[in-house]
């Protein structure tokens, strides 16, 4: 009798171990970009729910904070993020006469950005105008935008490559490299949570060359300008069947000469879908 009980326990233990091994993915198992994409789309909502939110308006409050290299105080103000199909608008009104707003829009054809009272573009406006294809291709704004590139990726003539896991703020994220003939010198990486597959971070590295000379009789020399823009998305909430981030943070670093950095942080509090949006909304000056 004792021998039968012992054999039963051994058999039961073997079954438990076998089940545990079958349920645990192999550590060396590599995901594909297609698998990450499929799971990411499911994290947003059903195709039916997403289709009902092709017109979106998000309203909230934001702040602009100088992090390095800029002299000035933190600015605050109201924020609006609107989109319909591929059209997009991002506006942050700020409490400063010298730096009154951030404005960027895309009407399906042209990217426009607001200008400062001096006639110059803001650092963010300059970056987005120079690297306008991240807006035209639907990458900027991530899942906040109805034109998010991953919603209709097959039609974008672009490529995704799975680049493994990467540490970010003490957590591991799935990394996808995005490439397209339209992105030029831009290096674009997209990051996703390992458990929910929500898109939580985009990184854009942009390098451009300027011809510089202090003497018109001499040949100009090339000087590189390197920029990095990071978008962060968090505080996800289900709104009318779609899961969207309520907190949106942009961080722009300019590595020319001395490193400078600015941060725009937004907290959305109101979401409106099915709004009728005028075409004029998606052009700013």
Which stretches of residues belong to each language-model region?
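Short, surface-exposed beta-strand/loop "edge" segments at domain boundaries and coil↔beta transitions
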Residues: 65-71, 96-103, 119-124, 183-187, ...
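Gly/Pro-enriched, hydrophobic low-complexity segments
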Residues: 20, 165-284
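Bacterial N-terminal signal peptides
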Residues: 7-17
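Short amphipathic beta-strand/extended segments with alternating polar/hydrophobic composition
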Residues: 73-76, 103-108, 120-132, 216, ...
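Flexible, processing/modification-adjacent segments and terminal tails
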Residues: 24, 28-35, 42, 110-186, ...
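Positively charged n-region of N-terminal signal peptides that target proteins for export
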Residues: 1-4, 21
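N-terminal mature ectodomain segment of secretory-pathway/periplasmic proteins
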Residues: 39-120, 154-164
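Bacterial Sec-dependent signal peptides at the C-terminal "C-region" and cleavage site
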Residues: 16-26
């Amino acid at each position: 009798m004792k021998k039968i009980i012992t054999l039963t326990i051994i058999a039961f233990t073997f079954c438990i171990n076998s089940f545990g091994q079958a349920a645990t993915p192999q550590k060396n198992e590599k995901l594909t970009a297609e698998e990450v994409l499929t799971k990411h789309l499911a994290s947003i909502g059903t195709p039916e729910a997403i289709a009902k939110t092709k017109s979106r308006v998000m309203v909230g409050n934001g702040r602009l904070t100088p992090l390095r290299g800029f002299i000035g105080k933190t600015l605050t103000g109201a924020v609006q993020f609107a989109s319909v199909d591929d059209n997009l608008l991002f506006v942050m009104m700020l409490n400063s006469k010298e730096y009154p707003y951030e404005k960027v829009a895309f009407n399906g054809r042209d990217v426009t950005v607001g200008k400062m009272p001096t006639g110059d573009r803001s650092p963010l406006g300059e970056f987005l105008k120079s690297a306008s294809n991240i807006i035209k291709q639907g990458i900027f704004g991530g899942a906040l935008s109805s034109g998010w590139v991953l919603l209709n990726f097959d039609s974008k003539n672009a490529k995704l490559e799975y680049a493994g896991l990467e540490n970010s703020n003490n957590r591991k994220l799935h990394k996808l490299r995005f490439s397209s003939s339209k992105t030029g010198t831009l290096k674009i990486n997209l990051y996703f949570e390992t458990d929910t597959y929500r898109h939580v971070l985009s990184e854009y590295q942009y390098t451009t060359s300027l011809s510089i000379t202090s003497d018109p009789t001499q040949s100009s020399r090339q000087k590189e300008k390197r920029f990095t823009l990071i978008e962060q998305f968090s505080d996800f909430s289900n709104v009318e069947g779609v899961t969207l981030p309520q907190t949106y943070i942009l961080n722009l670093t300019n590595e020319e000469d001395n490193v400078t950095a600015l941060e725009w942080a937004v907290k959305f509090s109101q979401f409106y879908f099915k709004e009728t949006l005028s075409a004029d909304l998606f052009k700013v000056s």
